[in-house]
Structure formats: structure tokens, C-alpha cells
Amino acid sequence: MKQFSAKFALALSAAAGQALAASTQGISEDLYNRLVEMATISQAAYANMCNIPSTITVGEKIYNAQTDINGWVLRDDSTKEIITVFRGTGSDTNLQLDTNYTLTPFSTFSECSGCEVHGGYFIGWSSVQDQVMSLVKEQADQYPDYTLTVTGHSLGASMATLAAAQLSGTYDNITLYTFGEPRSGNEAFASYMNDKFTATSADTTKYFRVTHSNDGIPNLPPAEQGYVHGGVEYWSVDPYSAQNTYVCTGDEVQCCEAQGGQGVNDAHTTYFGMTSGACTW
């Protein structure tokens, strides 16, 4: 096992070197700390928002019994932001959504012309859409000078992406952070997200798609089925740090997706040392 681990580490190091040629290694400590904070919130969603920063007020819960979609609308008065977070896969019901790869018209949001999204996640989003829009509006009306943030891990990452897209039709001040996000839609959807969230470069992006090592979930659903990633990828390589975070723009297969990870693996469940729902950070 140690020999295998050593070989894998060498292979990953070599792959990181190749990615460096096409990407930028290292981000600012401020941005790194921000990504860690959002990862903390996303991982805490698996365990009823445990151990989140003390500045955050936990508000109303988002929930639908038929789809088992869970989330919360939070508020951080220290940063003046309203945060919507979605839990990742936590049940067999969620797994049924995960494996429904049929591309489906994004019919709840007509502004996204030609957009098709993951069929299972669209079912999930449709089941909580009214709740989310209502709860966010309630907070935004009460705190009009606050910005909006949407985040989530795994299934929750794709839910966050669909939510951010829909919210973008009403609000301009949205930032999206996803962790271990599956491919959420087709090329038209990715293009819409990149345009709306200025994700054509790391200097302007408001769509931070964070990946880790050889996380296998960002490789799903297969690109061959018409799926395309959006956002600017921030690829975290162990040992995790600001310096070991790569900024990957352009071809999505040059960083995490090039590592050959398959499905749910250790790299998927743990981001920046925090394991989904463990609450040990």
C-alpha cells in the first residue's frame, strides 16, 4: 500500500507539473482563506451546520421530502453577505438524482437560452426553487446592502450552480463557490454561467469551481454525453495550501479531470482537510 501511495504521489506530482505549464500555480492567502471558509460551510451542511464561523447566523432551512434536497440560508453580518448552502448526497433518494444524467431544458429560467442541465439536479432544484427564491428575497429585502453567496459540495455544488443561475435573473451581486462539482449542464449553460459570472479569467470570476487532487466526481457526467464545466477551476493539490492551489482556465481536462479519478473517492469527500459532515475542523 505504501509503495502504491508513493507511486501515486509521484504521478500526481508529475501531473501537477504538466498542469503548471498550462495554468497558474499559487493564489493569494486572502483568496485561499476565503475558499477554505466556503468549504467549511459546504462540508458542515452534511451535519446541520456544525462548527461554522461564529459570525454566521443560521437562518431558515431549505428542504423537500420527496427529493431529500437540504440547504440553509445563512447570514454573515461581519462580511455583509447572505449565504445559501446546499448539502451534498446524503441518501438513496439523492443517489437517484445523481445518476439521472439525462440533459433537461432549464425550463424554470427562460433567460438561459438553449440551456440544458443535469436531469436529476433539475428535479432537485425544481423541488426547492420556490423556497430558495422566497427565503433569499426575504433576507435581501431586509439587508439590501448585503451581497449574495451560493455554495455547496458534490450534489450540493450542482444545486448551488442551478440556484445561482436562477438568482442571477433577479440579483447582480452573486458569487458562487462549488466544491467537487459534477458537470451540471451543456455548453450553452456553461457559457451562460461564464458570461453572467464573468468567469472568463481568474481576475474577474465570480464563479469559483474548486476541485481536489484526483476527485472523480468532476469527471461526471461524461463530457461525451454533452456536458461541459463552467467557472474558473481552482485545483487544490496535497499538501493543501495557497501555493499548492492551481488556477485552471480554458481546457477543463488539464487539472483535476486529467488525474483519472473515478466516482466518490477520498479526494472527493475531503477538501482542505475537512471531511464531509465530520465536524472535526
From Swiss-Prot:
<feature type="binding site">
    <location>
        <position position="101"/>
    </location>
    <ligand>
        <name>substrate</name>
    </ligand>
</feature>
<dbReference type="GO" id="GO:0006629">
    <property type="term" value="P:lipid metabolic process"/>
</dbReference>
<dbReference type="GO" id="GO:0005576">
    <property type="term" value="C:extracellular region"/>
</dbReference>
<comment type="similarity">
    <text>Belongs to the AB hydrolase superfamily. FaeA family.</text>
</comment>
<feature type="disulfide bond">
    <location>
        <begin position="50"/>
        <end position="279"/>
    </location>
</feature>
<feature type="binding site">
    <location>
        <position position="268"/>
    </location>
    <ligand>
        <name>substrate</name>
    </ligand>
</feature>
<comment type="function">
    <text>Involved in degradation of plant cell walls. Hydrolyzes the feruloyl-arabinose ester bond in arabinoxylans, and the feruloyl-galactose ester bond in pectin.</text>
</comment>
<keyword id="KW-0624">Polysaccharide degradation</keyword>
<dbReference type="Pfam" id="PF01764">
    <property type="entry name" value="Lipase_3"/>
</dbReference>
<feature type="signal peptide">
    <location>
        <begin position="1"/>
        <end position="21"/>
    </location>
</feature>
<keyword id="KW-0964">Secreted</keyword>
<feature type="active site" description="Charge relay system">
    <location>
        <position position="268"/>
    </location>
</feature>
<dbReference type="InterPro" id="IPR002921">
    <property type="entry name" value="Fungal_lipase-type"/>
</dbReference>
<feature type="disulfide bond">
    <location>
        <begin position="248"/>
        <end position="255"/>
    </location>
</feature>
<feature type="active site" description="Charge relay system">
    <location>
        <position position="215"/>
    </location>
</feature>
<feature type="glycosylation site" description="N-linked (GlcNAc...) asparagine">
    <location>
        <position position="173"/>
    </location>
</feature>
<feature type="glycosylation site" description="N-linked (GlcNAc...) asparagine">
    <location>
        <position position="100"/>
    </location>
</feature>
<feature type="active site" description="Nucleophile">
    <location>
        <position position="154"/>
    </location>
</feature>
<dbReference type="GO" id="GO:0045493">
    <property type="term" value="P:xylan catabolic process"/>
</dbReference>
<keyword id="KW-0858">Xylan degradation</keyword>
<keyword id="KW-0325">Glycoprotein</keyword>
<keyword id="KW-0732">Signal</keyword>
<keyword id="KW-0119">Carbohydrate metabolism</keyword>
<dbReference type="InterPro" id="IPR051299">
    <property type="entry name" value="AB_hydrolase_lip/est"/>
</dbReference>
<feature type="binding site">
    <location>
        <position position="98"/>
    </location>
    <ligand>
        <name>substrate</name>
    </ligand>
</feature>
<feature type="disulfide bond">
    <location>
        <begin position="112"/>
        <end position="115"/>
    </location>
</feature>
<keyword id="KW-0719">Serine esterase</keyword>
<dbReference type="GO" id="GO:0030600">
    <property type="term" value="F:feruloyl esterase activity"/>
</dbReference>
<keyword id="KW-0378">Hydrolase</keyword>
<protein>
    <recommendedName>
        <fullName>Probable feruloyl esterase A</fullName>
        <ecNumber>3.1.1.73</ecNumber>
    </recommendedName>
</protein>
<keyword id="KW-1015">Disulfide bond</keyword>
<dbReference type="InterPro" id="IPR029058">
    <property type="entry name" value="AB_hydrolase_fold"/>
</dbReference>
